[in-house]
Amino acid sequence: MLRGEEVELPRFNFNLGKKEYKGDKLRIDEHTILILEGIHALNPELTPQIPAASKYKIYVSALTTISLDDHNWIPTTDNRLLRRIIRDFNYRGYSAQETISRWPSVRAGEDKWIFPYQENADVMFNSALLFEFAVLRCHAEPILTSVPRNCPEYPEAYRLLKFIKYFTPVQDKEIPPTSLLREFLGGSSFKY
């Protein structure tokens, strides 16, 4: 692609666990703006052939800035995990139990492949929304309550259920289709 050749772009099918090619093709030239999106896009090992002066790096993460009270702050990992549970359920066919089970591996991958490079970004964008937990509650509760009590993931599901009950539920009909929250809830006007 960087040599100007046309390439076929794959999409990852999470239900099948593999990438698929469906005829989406792309050719770029020296005037094309190339946007690399994804959690690994800041890793310089992925783009050594692109000069540093030609890159503008943006780090996007849900950096929660609210607290339950004066003493109990909300970890950004809870926001990200709730988003992931809902997204995985809606788009990947994973149960909350499966997502919670994978979470330690996801966190280890972040520590190794994402967080070391976040400081290299030219700008950081906080994607957390002040009203987000109130909306996530409506989606997360039924998914989290399906985790069986006798499985190892139940304590985490129970903790998250207790946590989101602090927020008055807000129905997502109030959320416009252009909101980034729609990436997780569904109903977006954008194609992912």
Regions found by a protein language model. Give the residues of each.
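Short beta->alpha connector loops
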Residues: 39-42
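Structural recognition of the conserved hydrophobic beta-strand(s) that form the central parallel beta-sheet
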Residues: 33-37, 58-59
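Conserved NTP phosphate-binding and transfer environment spanning the P-loop NTPase/kinase superfamily
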Residues: 44-192
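ATP-dependent small-molecule kinase phosphotransfer cores
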Residues: 1-34, 94-103
